[in-house]
């Protein structure tokens, strides 16, 4: 099944919260997730000239703000992070940013999806052409929600998978290799264990 870009939010078997963002793509497969600094992971084209072909293929997919991790499928990562820096509650930062940015104005009206994760709470959100939703979710060890731009743009217990891996690297590989979801390109994970751990593949 092809679900495009998606987020996986859950806990490892050991109970460590994580979020993984995976790029799955038919149109722009030549991209990489790159750790830019201690607080940022970006999605970049391998050929920088591709940046001029589509405004939606280059963006920060992960931002860390203190004890808060933000992961999304687009430039709204930075907007959410900025609002959290200003002191907005997570729900409000998500709501404001998604409503302000709206869905992507591409040929597919691609939804914007987002996750905000702390040690004690986890939020998921999206804005599509026909809907907007923010939801606080409870995480269970060894399980994870997934939220995608195509086919699975919902926040529901029906969109839960079992996840293997103890480290950020292992979780990233698991999500990249997850065969049910086609066309993997690159992925990035933030895992919370004695602070945030970043990994890309």
Curated annotation (Swiss-Prot):
The reaction(s) this protein catalyses: IMP + H2O = 5-formamido-1-(5-phospho-D-ribosyl)imidazole-4-carboxamide
A single MF term (Gene Ontology): IMP cyclohydrolase activity
GO biological process: 'de novo' IMP biosynthetic process
Coiled-coil positions: none
InterPro entries, per the entry: IMP_cyclohydrolase (IPR010191), IMP_cyclohydrolase-like (IPR020600), IMP_cyclohydrolase-like_sf (IPR036795)
Membrane-spanning parts: none
Annotated EC: 3.5.4.10
Gene3D superfamilies: Inosine monophosphate cyclohydrolase-like
Pathway: Purine metabolism; IMP biosynthesis via de novo pathway; IMP from 5-formamido-1-(5-phospho-D-ribosyl)imidazole-4-carboxamide: step 1/1
NCBIfam families named in the record: PRK04151.1, purO_arch
Family: Belongs to the archaeal IMP cyclohydrolase family.
HAMAP family: IMP_cyclohydrol
Function: Catalyzes the cyclization of 5-formylamidoimidazole-4-carboxamide ribonucleotide to IMP.
Name the UniProt record assigns to this protein: IMP cyclohydrolase
Source species of the chain: Methanococcus maripaludis (strain C7 / ATCC BAA-1331)
Taxonomic classification: Archaea, Methanobacteriati, Methanobacteriota, Methanomada group, Methanococci
Gene that encodes the chain: purO
């Amino acid at each position: 099944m092809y679900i495009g870009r998606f987020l996986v939010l859950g806990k490892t078997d050991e109970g460590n919260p994580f979020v993984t963002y995976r790029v799955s793509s038919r149109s722009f497969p030549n991209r990489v997730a790159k750790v830019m600094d201690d607080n940022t992971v970006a999605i970049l084209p391998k050929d920088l000239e591709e940046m001029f072909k589509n405004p939606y293929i280059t963006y920060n997919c992960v931002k860390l703000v203190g004890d808060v991790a933000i992961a999304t499928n687009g430039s709204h990562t930075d907007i959410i992070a900025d609002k959290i820096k200003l002191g907005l509650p997570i729900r409000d930062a998500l709501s404001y940013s998604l409503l302000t940015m709206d869905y992507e104005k591409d040929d597919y009206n691609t939804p914007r999806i987002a996750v905000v994760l702390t040690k004690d709470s986890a939020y998921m959100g999206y804005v599509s052409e026909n809907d907007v939703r923010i939801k606080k979710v409870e995480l269970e060890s060894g399980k994870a929600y997934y939220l995608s731009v195509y086919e699975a743009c919902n926040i529901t217990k029906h969109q839960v998978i079992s996840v293997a891996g103890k480290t950020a690297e292992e979780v990233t590989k698991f999500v990249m290799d997850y065969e049910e979801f086609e066309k993997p390109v690159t992925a990035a994970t933030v895992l919370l264990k004695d602070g945030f751990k970043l990994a890309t593949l």
